[in-house]
Design a protein with these regions (language model features):
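Structural signature of WD-repeat beta-propellers
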Residues: 23, 161, 205-207
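Conserved beta-strand position repeated once per blade in WD40 beta-propeller domains
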Residues: 3-8, 70-72, 143-146, 191-194
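Structural signal for glycine-centered tight turns and loop->strand junctions in beta-sheet-rich domains
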Residues: 4, 12-15, 26, 78-79, ...
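Hydrophobic/aromatic beta-strand positions that recur at structurally equivalent sites within the blades
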Residues: 30-34, 120-122, 166-169, 211-216
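Loop/turn-rich, solvent-exposed surfaces of beta-rich toroidal or solenoidal domains
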Residues: 15-16, 68-180, 184-185
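Long, internal scaffold/assembly segments composed of regular secondary structure
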Residues: 1-66
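Blade-level signature of beta-propeller repeat domains, shared across WD40, Kelch, NHL, RCC1
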Residues: 188-216
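Residue-level signal for well-ordered, solvent-exposed loop/turn and beta-edge residues enriched
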Residues: 7, 126-128, 173-175, 201, ...
Length: 216
């Protein structure tokens, strides 16, 4: 198992369960969640027709050999996004099995802030699941991102110049559209999920309580 919570994607005839697998360099996988289409042919490298898509997470880095996310796949429409939760460095003598603690409690520190997110999409016309875009600049340290299809924006929290920040990314292009520097570790999400209230405020938990951002 990968530890990632399954997500549901799709409408009409193309409906899927989306997960990341347990490979060292994770893949994003789609599984038909209803009856498998009668004319469906197994994708390359797969013997199980239930698998509708299998895409390797590369972050556009040809030298990448390992990457993992501690979050479930973020789904919006036929798009599926994963983030990097691996610290870029581990101090000498620090136990590798505890590396997630660096991201959990020091995720804004430039030495430990993970960077990178990659979006994949299912094309109902060609029935192909493939990479859409990569953003290597933005950090999504440990929080669970949120996509708002109304604003076409993905929101997350991560490290920016050694401080915590709310980040907004265009869901279609992957370009950064918002950076709100919040500052100290009081704003560390500590693996909390982002959500939007009825008035459009973005909110998330921290170790010290809730954060609610103004609208506009």
């Amino acid at each position: 198992g990968s530890g990632a919570t399954p997500a549901l994607m799709g409408i009409c005839n193309d409906r899927f369960v989306v997960v990341t697998d347990g490979d060292a360099q994770m893949n994003v996988m789609l599984f038909w969640r209803d009856a498998i289409p009668q004319d469906w042919e197994n994708i390359e490298g797969q013997t199980n027709p239930r698998v509708a898509g299998n895409a390797l997470v590369t972050m556009d880095d040809a030298n990448l050999t390992a990457i993992q996310s501690e979050q479930g796949v973020v789904v919006g429409g036929y798009g599926a996004l994963v983030v990097n939760n691996d610290s870029p460095t581990i101090p000498d003598g620090y136990p590798a099995k505890a590396a997630r603690l660096l991201v959990a409690y020091s995720g804004a520190d430039p030495a430990f802030a993970p960077h990178g997110m990659q979006k994949f999409s299912w094309d109902p016309a060609t029935r192909v699941f493939a990479s859409d875009w990569v953003n290597q600049e933005v950090s999504s340290a440990n929080g669970v991102p949120l996509v708002s299809l109304g604003s076409n924006t993905l929101y997350t929290v991560g490290g920016r110049d050694g401080k915590w920040a709310l980040e907004g990314i265009d869901w279609t292009t992957g370009e950064s559209v918002l950076t709100w520097i919040t500052g100290s570790s009081r704003y560390n999400t500590v693996f909390a999920e982002l959500f939007i209230d009825d008035e459009g405020h973005i909110m998330h938990g921290t170790a010290f309580g809730m954060v609610r951002y103004p609208v506009g």
